Amino acid sequence: MSGGQSELSRLLTAAETAAPVDAADVVAEDLRQRFEAARVSFLIVDLTGKAVARLSTAPATGGRQAERIPMSGSAYDEVIRTQRLYQEVTDQGHRVIMPVTNRGDAIGLLELLLPADPGEDVLAAVGEAAHALAYIVIANGRFTDLYTWGKRSRPPTLAAEIQYQLLPSSLSCEAAQFTLCGSLEPSENLSGDTFDYTLDRDTLHVSVTDPMGHDLDAALAATILVSALRGARRAGAGLAEQARLADQALADHGHGHATGQLLRVHLRTGQAQFVNAGHPWPLRMRQGDVEVITCEVDHPFGLSVFAPHPYRVQDLDLRPGDRLLMFTDGMVERHGGKVDLATLLKHTRDLHPREAALALTSEVRDAAGGRLEDDATAMCLDWHGPHETQRHVSSGADTRQASAVREKRQP
């Protein structure tokens, strides 16, 4: 197809012209007309990571009742895991499914039913539209609850709403030097687990926290804790000062205590440091072997009055090819105690952190019969090394890191 750039520009302009709630529908309708498709749909991955919701269908059939489809064993699951297009011939036409992904964050899928076998030009144009759709969804998500609603299988409680808002807007991120993803399986009464990450010019910041209590009390404690950590981090505070301010915030506002782990990795040197505030020790997998990273454990946030000493910043040996797993006690206590986390980490070594983190928390939930007594949270970080300066990108994903085709990177 010629004039690909002009088509992309026209598509973005059309999405910008439409109301935020209609932007995805505009993309779907544009593709339907361009390729005479019988159906074009955008499906968004829900919060569980185990199902998709069909948010837009062109031509529209009226209403916005989302069709929810379990992904396990389906073509949708294959596309999310491999980050590659899927196509098949059906009785109704040629079915094409493309990933809608931004920096490794698997937002959803673009599905088309075409009248004839698509050529390379058509597939390239659809792939380009799917990549553009990722940016369109992210941009318009600031103005509408449509995509948030699509991610939820049921209305959240007040505590759950607070907890969701404390998580990063994207649970997964790919960069040249690292790939990471967090997964949270909430308990029946919500325990306030959170994880967070961000980048500044040359540093990756990661945190995993677990306040005491349940339901709204835990959610409010988590709000104070995460806000204190973010505020300190954004003000340029070092790890020890971030920990001190988080501790002070919980103590000053009477919201009990919380365990946590703060990690900082310098992207240009690979130097890694962390603070452990009464939290479970992390696991590190190196060349297929899993080991516990034993470290000095300081008092939980909020308890400095009983143990008034500074938080210690410790070095962490992190080498290219390592996988680091940070988690909360719900992964190893109660029903989590039935799961051999180290062995499971080995078994999931060929999975992208997105699928690996989900597999780990899902295993704990299954061990509890689907009714967790404590939140189970895992943050999976693959360190590629400071020598890496560029991702190998195809439509928003680093295809070398996809679960089906993960390649060994050499320093």
What residue ranges belong to the model's regions?
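Regulatory cytosolic signal-relay segments
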Residues: 129-190
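Signal-transmission linkers at sensory-effector interfaces
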Residues: 1-17, 139
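Primarily the active-site beta-strand->alpha-helix module of PP2C/PPM metal-dependent phosphatases
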Residues: 8, 128, 132, 136, ...
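Active-site-proximal, acidic helix/loop segment immediately C-terminal to a metal-coordinating Asp/Glu
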Residues: 215-235, 297, 318, 322-371, ...
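PP2C/PPM family metal-dependent serine/threonine protein phosphatase catalytic domain
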Residues: 177-191, 243-253, 280-315, 396-411
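A short, aliphatic-rich beta-strand micro-motif
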Residues: 86-102, 108
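Structured interaction and signal-relay segments at domain junctions
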Residues: 12, 16, 23-84, 277-278
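Catalytic core of PPM/PP2C metal-dependent serine/threonine phosphatase domains
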Residues: 18, 35-37, 155, 159-168, ...
